[in-house]
Amino acid sequence: KEDMIVLKKSEKMLSINDAIQKLIDSLKKITNDIIIVSDRDKVICSTDKNFLNENIDERVINAIDERKILDGINFKVGKKVIEGKFYMSPVIVEADALGSVIILSNKEINDKLIILNNVINVIISMKLY
């Protein structure tokens, strides 16, 4: 019986990851920028499949822990440094910081990208609640 409960939780998480992946793939068509969703230390969904399961930038891990928005230049994914600008917001559900939404861009981070990041974040938070 305990195995069934664990399996149901795993199935739910898999379906959430699938839904998030479809969402960010669709939104990439609007922006052409890279969108990454992470848990507390690894990429779980990305519009660039090369980043899946890679460790996220240490600055993002700290921002998740501190529940802070972060923006900057040159983002590290695994051992690769992606040149350009990034904007990250932590995914917070019931006061728990669970991960992040990150947009990587080769242009300035504008209001449209910030709003897009926030929309993705809200949808993920609602799915996990």
Question: Which functions belong to the PLM regions below?
Answer:
Residues K12-L27, N55-E66, G72, L98-S100, ...:
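Juxtadomain coupling helices with adjacent low-complexity linkers
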Residues V81-I92:
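A short beta-strand signature within small-molecule sensing/ligand-binding domains used
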Residues R40, S46, L52-K80:
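Regulatory sensory and allosteric helical modules in signal-transduction proteins
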Residues S10, R40-K42, K49, N106-E108:
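Short, ordered loop/turn segments at secondary-structure junctions
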Residues K1-M13:
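Short, structured interface segments
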Residues D25-C45:
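Short N-terminal helix-loop-first-beta-strand/juxtamembrane motif that initiates sensory/input modules
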Residues E2-I5, V91-V101:
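Short hydrophobic/glycine-rich mini-motifs in sensory/regulatory modules
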Residues S26-K29, K79-E83:
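Short loop/turn motifs at secondary-structure junctions and domain boundaries
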